[in-house]
């Protein structure tokens, strides 16, 4: 079994060694991929193609998607669910959508099997779980013929969900500020045009969503012995346009900004838009 750690959102899942994990936009995808020798010996056929291809319908077809959402306002689960299920049902052309309470550990939420049009050969299940300010969206989809092989394993993967108190291996900069994975140091002026004293600034470029970055920093700041004096979330009713933390450790005071940017070129910034990081040392 393989343990997957989502460092930004702070959760773990355990999945079979023959499964594949991939990052798909702002979600994490888990798919089974039966090696050809096993498929031939057990079922007389070979697993071929890419399980992430929607047209793939092999023995090992099926996909589990997990996506995080930042819920700083602590909105109730019901409106979040209604939005989630409405978008998903509309996209898939579903007509019958019910829901049932769902609880996993100390995370609570809702789940439903979405009944797709008869001409569609897929089964679709979805659910959302809320824990503190984090909401995890789950989606399981597979051909009806793959149900016997796929659903038991997918259920075990979802049931393995954990929120560890601490995730080891987080890197820090020279001031001791934790850095999310995949972020590289850049010149401050490459992110902010009006930096007149670059020696007192640190800047890091990456592609994590601004919601995921807020989840990361609110968890890691106290672990790394920083005191959070102020937090301005994004999005919010203010016109700040980014997320900001005021941090102090002993005599060192910093301002950390998470600056969202438009990667797609659409001209819009959303709660899942990627963000760069800038740090001002007082």
Regions found by a protein language model. Give the residues of each.
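Short glycine/proline-enriched loop/turn "hinge" motifs that connect secondary-structure elements
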Residues: 127-132
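Short, solvent-exposed beta-strand edge segments and adjacent coil->beta transition regions
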Residues: 1, 61, 135-137, 199-201
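Short amphipathic beta-strand starts and helix->beta connectors
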Residues: 120-124, 157, 184-189
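Short acidic/polar mixed-charge low-complexity motifs
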Residues: 9-13, 120-122, 134, 175-177, ...
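Surface-exposed amphipathic alpha-helical segments
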Residues: 19, 134-181, 277-282
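N-terminal "mature-domain start" segment
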Residues: 1-38, 162-191
